[in-house]
A protein has these predicted regions:
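A conserved SF2-helicase RecA2
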Residues: 139, 143-153, 300-353, 364-365
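Conserved helicase ATPase core of P-loop NTP-dependent helicases/translocases
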Residues: 27, 43-54, 219-223, 230-262, ...
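Conserved RecA-like P-loop NTPase helicase motor core
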Residues: 64-70, 85, 237-325
Length: 365
């Protein structure tokens, strides 16, 4: 929001289009700009939000709504793509098709991407490749700097006693095979053992977000958690939009304490009060891992940190959020698949191997 306001005030007469992929992000980005700059000449183009503004100097749009309507949008000077790691590396997807047409309308158009994960699964950096959209990283900031400066909430990842055994799970297209993960987690005994740890750690936590391997898994976990008096709901890709909106509002307002989901609340979902993440979804995708972590790093009143219960071994696999190495770079340099980390023998907090003192309990190594 501040970037757009500064741009428009420094160079009046520019037209800016901010693109993203879900209506929740469109609304969040628009609302934040209007809070920062109430007189902003901003509109929204999104079928999901029932708005199709085209005459404003600043337009917040969904790619699904505009990818075939470039001529309606007209001349744009700057396109900002939020969550730009979702732009495909090659081919004519919605983003690439739209950008190609917009470039015909204005050959001097510029494109800026915003993301917490400037790389894709198994394809390295967003600025690599002959057909890349982005040529340079203009600004990069370390996660720990943002935490130390008070812009993000710290994560406290914990190793679990009932961490999933993935030794028999195969890989397809760079990640664990979905059907095998479903079979692994479709186990009542395992679910009950996991539940014991979730309840023990969650007693002092107010807002839980749980990532599951599939729809059945998400619904099962919600059911057994609710049996213990925890207000719980589930969101999946099949949840009707009006039901989804109601559930999210109840979760954000604290009327629902626990929300389980399957691959729908990983990118751009903004619920600052979340103070416990539960990873029941193992992944080899570092991008997905970082996005899941990001759901707990928003600041909120009376929130000191966000606990991460990692049953999928993701933190050990990819490294703590402040000690990551992109998978593409790891392979290119021949480095180990798992960045170095260590686990506190006292409180089970996972941290960078370079740490000499546990950031949670103070144990010295």
């Amino acid at each position: 929001g501040e970037f757009i306001r500064g741009l428009m005030q420094t160079w009046p007469g520019q037209r800016v289009l901010l693109l993203t992929h879900v209506k929740e992000l469109i609304a969040q980005n628009y609302d934040k700009l209007m809070t920062l700059w109430p007189d902003a000449p901003a509109g929204i183009y999104s079928a999901g939000l029932n708005r199709r503004d085209t005459d404003h100097d600043i337009i917040f749009a969904g790619i699904q709504s505009v990818h075939k309507r470039a001529t309606e949008i007209g001349h744009i000077d700057l396109i900002i793509i939020d969550e730009c790691h979702l732009v495909p590396k090659s081919g004519m997807g919605m983003y690439l098709r739209f950008l190609k047409t917009m470039n015909v309308i204005n050959s001097k158009i510029r494109v800026v991407g915003l993301t917490a994960t400037p790389y894709r699964l198994n394809s390295g950096s967003l600025i690599d490749g002959d057909d890349r959209i982005f040529t340079d990283i203009a600004y990069d900031v370390d996660v720990m700097q943002l935490v130390n400066d008070g812009y993000l909430s710290p994560l406290v990842p914990k190793a679990m006693d009932n961490e999933f055994d993935l030794s028999e799970i195969n890989t397809r297209a760079g990640d664990y095979k979905t059907d095998q993960l479903h079979a692994l987690t479709d186990n009542d005994a395992l679910a009950r053992m996991v539940l014991v740890e979730i309840l023990a750690y969650g007693r002092q936590r107010k807002s839980w977000l749980i990532f599951c391997t599939g729809v059945n898994h998400a619904e099962k976990m919600a059911q057994i958690i609710a049996e213990h008096g925890i207000t719980t709901a589930t969101i999946t890709g099949a949840t009707p939009p009006d039901v989804r909106d109601t559930i999210l509002e109840l979760f954000k307002s604290g009327h629902i304490q626990c929300l389980t989901n399957c691959d729908v609340l990983t990118t751009g979902f903004d619920a600052p009060a979340i103070d416990m993440l539960v990873f029941l979804r193992p992944t080899q995708s570092q991008g997905l891992y970082v996005q899941m972590c990001g759901r707990g790093m928003r600041l909120a009143e009376s929130k000191n940190d966000c606990l991460v219960l990692d049953f999928g071994g993701n933190t050990q696999r990819h490294g703590p959020i402040n000690a990551l190495k992109p998978q593409g770079e790891q392979k290119a340099k021949g480095s180990k698949a798992t960045p170095p980390s260590r686990t506190c023998p006292v409180c089970k907090t996972i941290m960078a191997a370079s740490c000499t003192k546990c950031p949670d309990c103070g144990h010295r190594f």
